[in-house]
Amino acid sequence: FFAEFVEEVHKRGMKVILDGVFNHCGSFNKWLDRECIYEDAEGYEKGAYISADSPYRTFFRFNEDMWPYNYHYDGWWGHDTLPKLNYEDSPLLFDYIMHIARKWVSPPYNVDGWRLDVAADLGQSQEYNHYFWKEFRRNVKEANPEAIVLAEHYGDPTSWLQGDQWDT
């Protein structure tokens, strides 16, 4: 359905931009599963909140080894319902998000770009943030050179707008 929707939008002279929230997820996401939605659900791995052996364990930064039901993870601006994603320690998460960056701007979906939520707050350091967005842009532009990378940022965006990270 989505590919047909985008095609119809394009026929009408409009563009489709996806909202990418790559800084954090919800505490209900299967990766963390703080609400235990998937804990006993068939076909789902245990979330990182539930088990230290979760395949998603490295997707988050835990401050204490207190499983099961580990509340000691970093949240975006301290919000425990918005667990911050931990790209620096998780090549698996990084690769997964780069795959997503490419997938949606490629056929059959052909969306026209990404709007990036709280983009400058992504990693634990500005150096890593710049590295991540350079790789994100490279992946998007290799898949669709016409796709736009539009970021939400509060403050001076100059260092992000050098032609190798965000378009605007």
Where are these regions (language model features)?
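Transmembrane beta-barrel strand/turn architecture of Gram-negative outer membrane proteins
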Residues: 17-18
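Short, acidic/polar
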Residues: 90-107
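Proline-rich intrinsically disordered, low-complexity coils
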Residues: 55, 68, 83, 91, ...
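Short, flexible, mixed-charge acidic loops at enzyme active sites
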Residues: 61-77
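Active-site-proximal helices and loops of the catalytic beta/alpha 8
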Residues: 6, 10, 23-24, 29-59, ...
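The substrate-binding groove and active-site-proximal loops of carbohydrate-active enzymes
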Residues: 1, 27, 78-94, 117-128
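Short, solvent-exposed loop/turn segments at the edges of secondary structure
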Residues: 78-80, 109-111, 165
